[in-house]
Structure formats: C-alpha cells, structure tokens
Amino acid sequence: MANNRKSWASFDEMRKAAEEGDAQAQSYLGVSLQNGQGVAQDYQEAVRWFRKAADQNDPVAQCYLGFCFLTGQGVPQEYGEAARWFRESAEQGDPAAQFNLGMLY
C-alpha cells in the first residue's frame, strides 16, 4: 500500500482542510479527537469525522470507524458495523483492518 498521506503545518490548518472536505484531514482530526491530541477527547465527534472520511473511501478512517463500533467508543457497540468498516478498509489493503476483520471471525 503506497504511503501518500498528507501533512499540515498546524492543527488549525488540518481542521480547516477537514472542514473543506479533505478526507485525510478528516481522518487525522478524528484520530486527534479520539486520543485527545491537541483537543479535548471527544469520541462522538471523532466518529463524526471518521464517518465523513470513511464515506469518501479513506481506508484509515474506515479502520478507525470499525474500531469505534468494535469497542463502543462514541457509538453503540455493533460487531456487524465493525466488520463492515474493517472489510471496506481491508479491501483497500489496510493491514490493521485486515487483522481486525480476521479477529472478528
């Protein structure tokens, strides 16, 4: 899987890109919110950003969204939804999603 991930000069620049629809920025903003990096930890808001990026086929966001459904972070725990998002990501070659999908079976 090619590493063509973007980087931003500041958190504010990343947030602006996310708000403008950049899927990678949305994914990273979700990670920041999930982990409380640079912002207050907020699982529900993290899920919102993961979903925006996942709906644009971002495999990292799809994997994180699957993890949220697996663990019940920010959403009700739903193994079927976890599998759905891990599968979407795994089909794009994400190794973490492939591992997590395998663990569900």
Language model region names:
Residues 1-9:
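N-terminal leader/linker segments that initiate helical-solenoid repeat arrays
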Residues 10-24, 31:
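Leucine-rich, hydrophobic repeat-scaffold detector
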Residues 19-22, 35-37, 42, 55-59, ...:
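Short helix-capping/linker turns of helical repeat alpha-solenoids
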Residues 28-35, 64-71, 100-105:
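Hydrophobic face of amphipathic alpha-helices that form TPR/SEL1-like repeat modules
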